[in-house]
Design a protein with these regions (language model features):
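A conserved beta-strand element that flanks and buttresses the S-adenosyl-L-methionine
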Residues: 138
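Local beta-strand N-terminus motif with an aromatic residue
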Residues: 133-134
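Class I (Rossmann-like) S-adenosyl-L-methionine-dependent methyltransferase catalytic domain
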Residues: 2-74, 79-130, 146-192
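Short catalytic micro-motifs in class I SAM-dependent methyltransferases
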Residues: 141-145
Length: 192
């Protein structure tokens, strides 16, 4: 498999085996931290990271009919921080979280002067003050890798973060033809 410059070679078999081992232990999100830890502090070594904001998010921000300034946004599974930083640049007060402590460390090191509030948190057990607190709830390429029952729980949790009259924006990569819904998806398959 061709990799981005500076990335370790991605082994899809080892990846699927590793994810399956966590899922077999009913720990559907535990494997995320191992990917970030394996990157050894190099955000470009996280094989699913695009290292730029989602073009779909940027398009939405540019075409949105309301002002962004002063609104609260939350980024679920923020990864290495590109989307959170884009939202901040558009004027949002951004809380961005990931279940991986190592991902949050990468964000803070990558963006040392940021105004984004990067936190370690679990979508299934987030701080109570987050409930119904955000005008924008943004999720990109995270819940798609969860097994079915957890995707349903994740959708419910996302809705519970949303303030009245707020927006949920979800962006994900589609599965390949023939892939089953609960198959462990291989990352970085993009079609535009």
């Amino acid at each position: 498999m061709t990799t981005k410059k500076g990335m370790k070679k991605f082994d899809p078999i080892a990846y699927k085996e590793m994810v399956k081992s966590y899922q077999d232990e009913d720990n559907p999100t535990g494997w995320f931290d191992s990917i970030y830890t394996d990157a050894q502090g190099d955000h470009s070594a996280v094989f699913w990271a695009d290292l730029e904001p989602s073009p779909y998010l940027l398009e939405w921000l540019k075409n949105c009919v309301f002002k962004h300034t002063g609104r609260k946004a939350i980024v679920i599974g923020c990864g290495v921080g590109d989307d959170a930083e884009a939202l901040s640049e558009y004027g949002y007060e951004v809380t961005a979280f990931d279940i991986s402590p190592e991902a949050i460390r990468l964000c803070k090191n990558r963006y040392p002067d940021t105004t984004v509030n990067y936190l370690v948190a679990d979508l299934f057990d987030y701080p109570s003050q987050w409930a119904e607190n955000f005008e924008l709830v943004y999720e990109c390429n995270t819940i798609q890798v969860l097994p079915g029952k957890y995707r349903i729980q994740a959708r419910d949790a996302m809705v519970s973060l949303l303030a009245t009259q707020g927006y949920i924006l979800v962006s994900c990569r589609r599965r390949l033809k023939g892939e089953q819904e609960d198959d462990i998806p291989l990352p970085l398959i993009k079609r535009r």
